[in-house]
Amino acid sequence: MRILLLMRGVPGSGKSTFIKEQGLEPYTLSADALRLLYASPMLDNAGRWCISQHFDKQMWPFLLQTLEERMKRGCFTVVDATNIRGRDMTAYKKLANEYKYRIYVVDFTDITIEEAKKRNLLREEYKQVPENVIERMYAQLADNKVPSGITVIKPGELSHIWYKPRDLSAYKKVIHIGDIHGCYKPLKEYLEEINPQNYYIFLGDYIDRGSENAEVLQLLLQLAALDNVTLLEGNHEANLRDYGLEDSNASKEFRMQTAPELAQAGLSRKAVYNFYRKLSQCFCYTYRGKKVLVSHGGLARMPENLSLVATAELIYGTGVYEDALDVDMSFAKHAAVNEYQVHGHRNYEGVPVEVNEHCFNLEGAVEMGGQLRALELSEDGFAVVTVGNALEYLDKKKGAKDSKANAKIENVQQLLANLAGNPLIKEKSFGVISSFNFTRDAFYNKAWDDVTCKARGLYINKRTEKIVARSYDKFFNLDERPETKLNALRHNLQFPVQALTEIS
């Protein structure tokens, strides 16, 4: 999860030993370990082996770069360094703010200078530092405090930072709501009002694909302020982050459809970004003897310590998209009799809500004409609720399908502009008529888009801007591309389907 744990103390104060004893070495970036990557131990002027600091100008930027890559995935991370000066922690604060991290400092500064010197001499020779270094750092401690916004704990208080399940037994029901994807009508049909006696958990993916993104977000902005509501972060919420920051990384679908809806509804970028900042990475709770893990993507087992699980795995789930069923089976295999999992995000096989006796899948493809899935837990146990999608939305999606592959090309002038000068398109002129075909580079590099797929036996009269002949768009094997995977085909194909065999 998004937790950064900084060690703070002079050499010999016990930082590295603490990390080892707590089993945190796999999660640690160590300044000395990185120094040893740049240079092996060297002899000092007294003939003793030591860790060289000659490459610190390269090492520190590398450590921060590595830390940022881990933060992008939401990895729990420990930084093993002295962190004596307040300014040493400024860069960490900046990254933590950008990636929604909480920072803790484990404080080893109360050890006496005599004890630190004694412990220093007990370390392996190459790990020892001169006594004057320890003395200098002790002198710096008096003038340097931990910056605001960073929580300081003692080594014996490490358990305070770990994620702990919340007891929801006082509520009448715990209600879980699956992927919404901009489908407001089925959400509102199910969620007529918020009952203060119930607790509500939304599993993420609130936007995109549907046609009512603004209405969904406006409702969730109101619910986010309630004490009995938790909103999880799904993978599509990264688009809200990018939108709020005016970043161009948002998906094309978001930029072309969702963003205009939000702007037209008067939802400011600041409000959208603040909403994203409030989203939770997961939610684990107990309810009258049951322990339930709720995440967007689903995990392969109930972790002993949720804080050590990367946020990316909580959002996208264990494994890849197609592994959802295997992951749920694994969870059930490892689960105690009272442990359960609820997730959304992926449903490659189209399984029902109750996958097995321990796992529930709330991805119902509501935006594809499926159902909004909900799961209610009360003293009577789990109960499944589904709400179908609106007919007008299905009509909208059908129209979108009809406009895709092999549809009539309406704007030939625009198509010619897209073909012209495209390095992946080969044009051959026959007077006023030109043929357009994708190049070998496009084929071997799999550089397929709307233009290269159409450039297949395509003949256009450039004077009249009319198509005189064309082949089918480039087609692909089953599972060759995301849109030809079985899970996608069940949404994209128009039935009845005619199957043909190509005889070579």
Task: Enumerate the predicted regions with their spans.
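Active-site-proximal "nucleotidyltransferase
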Residues: 398-503
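N-terminal active-site segment of His-dependent metallophosphoesterases
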Residues: 155-219
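Conserved GTP-binding G-domain of TRAFAC-class P-loop NTPases and closely related GTPase folds
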Residues: 2-8, 13, 21, 27, ...
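Active-site neighborhood of divalent metal-dependent phosphoester bond hydrolases
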Residues: 125, 132, 209-285, 289-292, ...
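Acidic, His/Gly-rich catalytic cores of divalent-metal-dependent hydrolytic chemistry
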Residues: 322, 327-401
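Glycine-rich phosphate-binding loop used to anchor ATP phosphates in small-molecule kinases
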Residues: 54-106
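ATP-dependent NMP and nucleoside kinases share a basic, alpha-helical "lid"
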Residues: 37, 41-45, 83-125
